[in-house]
Amino acid sequence: MKKSFSILSIFTLLIFSNLTINSCGSREDTVSCFPNAPINVILNLNLPAYYSLNQVGGWKYIDEQSSGTRGLIVVRASSTTFKIYDRNAPHICPDTNTTLEVKDDISVVCPKDNAKWILLTGQPTAVANVPPKTYLSNYDANSNVLNIYY
């Protein structure tokens, strides 16, 4: 009786340990071959080049130094918040035609497989089941400067 109780206890412990380890793992937001590059961009939104980012819903491609391997898509989500997307498709490995593009000012599209996301939220709407990779930013409303980093 003690032996079967001991075996049952060990078996139960192993099952719960396995469930705990697997359920607490981090969710992958991109495919494993997604390029990892440092991001450090400062945008002065007072400059004419960034005029489109002064209105909610406005967006701009950023292809400056330290803006990733294919650049960024910066979207003004509200008067004080921005969405910063990597232009690499998050659901497939980098290849020809996997650079994300904005279409009709409302969606982000991957030309390779026509995966789509909502521009303002990053929510997937077709093909992909993960949002575009996003980056952190700080916005100083007094100086109208946006700092993007990773």
Residue ranges and their predicted role:
Residues 27-105, 118-119, 133-150:
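N-terminal pre-ligand scaffold of iron-sulfur
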